[in-house]
Every structure is written in structure tokens, then in C-alpha cells.
A protein has these predicted regions:
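ATP/NTP-dependent adenylation/nucleotidyl-transfer catalytic domains that generate, transfer
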Residues: 1-14, 24, 28-33, 37-41, ...
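Active-site glycine-rich loop that binds ribose-phosphate moieties when present
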Residues: 16-19
């Protein structure tokens, strides 16, 4: 069982990779493609994705949108309020930790840090 591995981060990344292979099987079975959900903050701002996991997609239609823009898009499309306001999580951990727990900052703080180098959050982000 995967739960016997000691490296929890490795286990979470394995789950993302298994999810990706499942999505590719479903897509292939339906003559489809895998559409990414990564946004500007996650993918390009802080690199919050699993290589060969949730980063392994055919197209990334919202890659240039901030998380705030994605939420606004959802509202304009009539997506349920409960979905838009749900705390973001990658769903890879058994303890239900949120993106904010893992990143140490909210998406609002990350967006401000990406846009304004003088913001308080900018110094908290480890820029490569």
C-alpha cells in the first residue's frame, strides 16, 4: 500500500501523477484531451504543482489568469457560490490541508506580491 511510504510529500506527488494518468486514460477513451486547471499564481508565480502530475496537461486555458480572475470568471458563468467560495485545496493530503496551509500565504497575498515588489508578502515568497 502507498500508505507504507515514509515520505508524505512523495506520496502526495504520487497521487497527483496517478490522477494525471487516470485523466489521460479517460481522455483517450473519449477522443478527448486533458485540460489543465493551473492558473498564473500556481503555475508561474510559485510553482505550486506536481511535475508530471497536475502540470501534465494538453492545454492550459486559464494559465494566464490570476486566481481572483478565475473566481470572477466562475461568478459570471453562474458557477455555484459554494464551489467558488470553497477553500482551495489540491486534494492530495488525507488531512484536508488547504492551499493556504501549504503555501503559507493566501492567493490574495500571493497576487499582491507578484504585482508589487514593495508589498509585505513579496519578501515572504522565495523567488527563484
Amino acid at each position: 500500500s502507498l500508505s507504507n511510504f515514509k515520505n508524505n510529500h512523495g506520496l502526495a506527488n504520487s497521487r497527483a501523477r496517478l490522477r494525471m494518468t487516470t485523466l489521460y486514460q479517460v481522455a483517450a477513451s473519449n477522443n478527448g484531451i486533458v485540460v489543465g486547471t493551473g492558473n498564473k499564481v500556481e503555475d508561474f508565480g510559485v510553482g505550486f504543482y506536481t511535475k508530471y502530475g497536475d502540470g501534465g496537461v494538453d492545454i492550459s486555458p486559464i494559465a494566464d489568469c490570476t486566481k481572483t480572475q478565475v473566481w470572477e470568471m466562475g461568478k459570471s458563468l453562474g458557477i455555484m457560490k459554494e464551489i467558488i467560495e470553497a477553500e482551495p485545496t489540491d486534494g492530495l493530503w488525507d488531512d484536508g490541508r488547504t492551499d493556504t496551509n501549504q503555501l503559507g500565504m493566501s492567493y490574495d497575498e500571493l497576487e499582491k506580491a507578484m504585482m508589487d515588489k514593495t508589498s509585505e508578502g513579496y519578501s515572504k515568497v522565495s523567488w527563484n
